[in-house]
Amino acid sequence: MRILHTADWHLGKNIEGHSRMDEQACFLADFVEIVKDEKIDLLIIAGDVYDSYNPPARAEELFYETLKQLSDGGKRLILVIAGNHDNPQRLEAPGPLARDHGILMAGVPKTIIPTGAYGQHQVVAAGEGLCVIPASADTIRFPHLNYIPILDNGAVSPI
């Protein structure tokens, strides 16, 4: 399984009054090609997707279009986790639509991701800050809470 982790895109950022959206669009177009060329199976986007709690509409449109391309019709699994610059509820809002594309959205550390189909993948178990997805011969355990202890038997520690 090939996994790619990325973070801190800060879409919608302005520097001294100048938009960086055109640069960000070029970056994301290149990023999509890298993910395809490297045959990435699982993509983790770990926070600060946007530069502010209230990103410009163009930034949101760019993000959603990029996710759609990256998901490859639900073949590629994507986990998106909100960062301190993101509005957690806003980031999770398209979650029901994203499911068909294999995209899981976690806005807050204790998000319970609903079990069921996500594109061509299945979330078979979930709890606060954790979801479990079978993948070929492996099982993926996504602890999306910082420092969740996983016990030897695979259970989530009550601590």
Language model regions located:
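His/Asp/Glu-rich metal-coordinating catalytic cores
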Residues: P55, L79-I159
